[in-house]
């Protein structure tokens, strides 16, 4: 389950791998301006509020980095205006044309990727959406040298196509089987079939099934090349014993082809039911027989009902795999050699919650992972960069390289030549921040914040950053997402800015003509914990007036609503156009605040995080007379929809007058096994059945009586099934509790196809609840 923002935009991901080419067709100078364009006197501009339609489209969405490092000094990217593929030289600071967009004119292109040697262009077209990350496309290969096209996979829809590193060889997956396509100097050579047991919707090779795609890999790929491209590790998922979810697809109104609804069946493991059986295989791509070796899971450590969490290559000869037990509180990290033998292991256990082991890094005989470590504070443990000696004795020594009450969110890279680790972490006491830090790999110095010295074009300190490093770490792209609109710069490893990639000047000019909400951050102590609160106030806020307040909730475990990335979604419309205070509250269970707060939600979803939303809102009403306690509402999507329904059910003192739950979980017995069991365990009397019953909204509908409640769901939701809302609706109807319900026919979890209707529907609901004039 992944949090949804207030608006969603589908962008094609152009994953471009290209070695430097010597043939230059033309040279293009990128605009390297740092300027902020001012329109005469910005202070005297006539400003207007945001329109609702602007907040769920891309009107105020910032451009970020649209390239891929292909060497330590070159980036390949797509020109947003022309569609041409260009290569940018960081040292020369100029771009050269690699492929003209006209080569794709014959296709409705969704994706294109250059081969590592730069001779071939893989073009994906005729896209069909899969699940959250997966797509199916037809593919054609364009030979740049001979200007010829070659269709692959018999022009069938292919689930995945990927170039091997360093070569012009290709892996593609058709009907859940893996194919290896070789190329030689003379062009296309031959295709070898790697697997033969794939069954559509049942047995998957090289691509994940639904639950692994959504909850574990968060990707459409389950193949991992060795650094030289000679070997391939691939995962297989056997869903034969996994039960199916079934829903109906109703089709286009009035279309004779849709006279009868179509059944949609998906293998979907719910809590306590059988999971897919996962296996991992290693294949030598340069062996004519494609010899395969099983990389067996360490059953002694993680049991037979285990999960495959991460696969990576340490070097040419070793695969490092992270396995977990089913409830994800025991992890075994295993080093395999090319014979499938276990060389070494690292065992990690979490006794008070769940594990969140991510990518590993290696440097001079040590391995570096992100692991919970004591902070020396009452907040408990935080995820830190932890170094292990790779010899791994019985009790391997570990060293915390980032001690303090800050949360390391991601390790970016290790600069092998200088022995420095780069990572992203929150600020001290600032869970909403994400900054780029570095620390020596030997721990000889304290960490240094790199992005804390970077200023936005408006002159503010960057407080929310991402970084993309070149292969050897000599340069990096820094994307500053906040507090101001995003801007993108290239730095060298001495942290000197060498180039401005994107300043979003047009977005900044548009924002100069819009009213923006005032932002108020505060800490509120509730239920023995400090909750973070962010209030968005109307631009013309007057303390002597009384305003309605709308709380937008998610509250899922290990998530945040309050981050310092700039966004211009629903909150800017409600504040500037409707004069409604908009609130985010991060209470117990939220991330970046230490293990005590994080794990307080463990095995009891729908309890403490919901109580904090209610208690903090009540305290805000008592603290500030300008918050109208008679006009306070709440809404959320997905887990936030669950939180909304549970808030209304538990709010016996009527802190909230109304709420909207979009695509909510109503009972965790209906949700998928991997996500739910991570936080709740099993729904059995021996384990945590009482916890599941306690968090079932349908058992609490009587306490929703007297509040305005709207329930919204798409009937084609493959993630949080329509069954969830129907179960809640049935309970409300049986109890004779009045509510409103909107069903979006055939729409999936994100409701992409009906966003205008969705937001106009919500706007009318808030107008009624808050006694506002109807805007639409």
Curated annotation (Swiss-Prot):
Q: What class of enzyme is it?
A: hydrolase
Residues forming the catalytic site: 638, 717, 749
**Key word Signal present:** yes
User: Would the keyword Secreted be found if you checked this record's keyword annotation?
Assistant: yes
Q: Which GO terms describe its biological process?
A: proteolysis
Q: Where is the signal peptide?
A: 1-25
Principal location: secreted
* Species assigned in the record: Vespula vulgaris (Yellow jacket)
Identify the keywords attached in UniProt to this record, alphabetized.
Allergen, Aminopeptidase, Disulfide bond, Glycoprotein, Hydrolase, Protease, Secreted, Signal
Q: What family does the database annotate?
A: Belongs to the peptidase S9B family. DPPIV subfamily.
Q: What is this protein called?
A: Venom dipeptidyl peptidase 4
Q: Name one GO cellular component term.
A: extracellular region
